[in-house]
């Protein structure tokens, strides 16, 4: 039994690939902005573009330990860092009673 466990541990160690190979690397910095891209052989990748105003658009992605492909796109500008992904939490919907109250208040403004 111990030998089977040892063989399984060795197979898992070899398959872990702690040092992935770089498949593509681009770093292009110009006076009017930059382009950066990194792609690894384990499914991880990151890319970004930026302009002279400090605005950056980018994407980073990887494969989770569960085998799920995770992708996050983002924008960074004067409004801050704004990530978007299906895996990020979202706020709950506004309750119907609150929506009705807001509509009533807008339809009946105060007389002051």
Curated annotation (Swiss-Prot):
Classification via InterPro entries: CHIT_BIND_RR_consensus, Cuticle_Struct_Prot, Insect_cuticle
Chitin-binding type R&R domain sequence ranges: 31-92
Key word Ribonucleoprotein present: no
Cellular component, GO annotation: chitin-based extracellular matrix
Top-level division of the source organism's lineage: Eukaryota
UniProt record, GO biological process: chitin-based cuticle development
Pfam families: Chitin_bind_4
Signal peptide interval: 1-16
Keywords tagged on the record: Cuticle, Signal
Membrane-crossing segments per the record: none
Keyword Signal found: yes
One Gene Ontology molecular-function label: structural constituent of chitin-based larval cuticle
Primary role: Component of the larval cuticle.
Record protein name field: Larval cuticle protein 4
Species this protein is from: Drosophila melanogaster (Fruit fly)
Lineage: Eukaryota, Metazoa, Ecdysozoa, Arthropoda, Hexapoda
């Amino acid at each position: 039994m111990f030998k089977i466990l040892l063989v399984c541990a060795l197979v898992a160690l070899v398959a872990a690939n702690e040092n992935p190979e770089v498949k593509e690397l681009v770093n292009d910095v110009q006076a009017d902005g930059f382009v950066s891209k990194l792609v690894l052989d384990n499914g991880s990748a990151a890319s970004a573009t930026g302009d002279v105003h400090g605005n950056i658009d980018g994407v980073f992605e990887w494969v989770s330990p569960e085998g799920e492909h995770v992708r996050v796109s983002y924008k960074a500008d004067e409004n801050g860092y704004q990530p978007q992904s299906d895996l990020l939490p979202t706020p709950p919907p506004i309750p119907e009673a609150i929506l009705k109250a807001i509509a009533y208040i807008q339809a009946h403004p105060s007389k002051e």
